[in-house]
Amino acid sequence: MSRWPSRRHFLKTVLGSAALLVGSGAYAFGIEPAFRLRIQRYTPKPRNWPNDLPMWIAAIAAIHIGEPYMPLSRVDEIVATTNALAPDLIVLLGDYVAGHRFTTRAIGMAELAPRLAELRAPLGTYAILGNHDWWDDRTAQRNRRGPIIAARALHDADVPVLENEAVRLAKDGQPFWLLGLGDQLALLPPKDQQSGRKRLQGVDDLAGTLAQATDDAPAILLAHEPDIFPKVPNRVALTLSGHTHGGQVRLFGYSPLVPSRYGNRYAYGHVVEDERHLIVSGGLGTSILPVRFGVPPEIVVVDLGAHRADIASLAPAGPEGTAA
């Protein structure tokens, strides 16, 4: 008997592989980025977060508004799902505007911000800004400063924006700090910069933000890009970030392309280094290309302190629920 496969077997293998590739491509372009939505839960145990201060935080990252992948109806679904989780606090981690050119209808912040204002939590909803929010504002790029369009729209919708700012909140009489960092990649290289290595410039001020936390109450830091994490001191119990989209393509815990100088180190999920905790959301939308594979759009829920009941009993029936 020949050791070589028959022609029929060879053709079946080739055609089957081709069908798998076509199907995977259709899923990555048409299904996962536009229709899937999961709840991703984390239960970190930061050393400097008191166990008797239970906190249920919902984090929304990288909406990247724009049809057909992120229409306003999809945002309404995300808002309704988040509200149904009944979080104590909601945080928006930046990148609200479209991140690629594959849009059939552009949707501005003036339309998106009122939808986000429908988010409900006892301790409120707080936002930071992302690099795409800055890059989309040509006036801000020309002037090398804000406030940018996204910040003004959120402000007009009564959604507070923290840009190198700290706010002191309290739950059940126990205080904590919420710190919002300015974007680390906000300013594109000037057009007249013709030679040399072109560098993006940030508007972040970590030291100035930390200095506003004037007592020893525990602190949570919102930072759009996770690359700041090595500089975050133990003073901060938890850092929440977005930006990476988990690489948009993620297989077996590995992302081939991650928009971070650290590669897969901070690509996605819960990271603990030197007893410091970071959670990186995979976000909701897409940038560069409208592709997601292995990292579905997600709403992140962070369960701090004494943990709540299982998330399956709290999430609505539609979106997928997962725990981590």
Predicted segment positions?
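C-terminal segment of N-terminal export signals and the immediately downstream linker at the start
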Residues: V22-A58, E77-A80
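N-terminal secretory signal peptides and thylakoid transit peptides that target proteins
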Residues: M1-L21
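Active-site neighborhood of phospho(di)ester-bond hydrolases with catalytic His/Asp-centered motifs
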Residues: I60-A61, I90-D95, T125-N131, L162-N164, ...
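Active-site-proximal beta-strand elements of phosphoester/diester hydrolases
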Residues: P54-H64, P175-L185, I220-A223, H277-G283
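Conserved beta-sheet core of the metallophosphoesterase superfamily
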Residues: I220, E225-D303, R308-D310
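Membrane-embedded segments
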Residues: W56-R152, D156-P160
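Binuclear metal-dependent hydrolase catalytic cores centered on His/Asp/Glu-rich metal-binding motifs
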Residues: D137-V159, K171-A219, F229, R292
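Beta-strand-turn-beta hairpins that frame and shape the catalytic cleft
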Residues: P46-I57, A166-L178, V272-H277
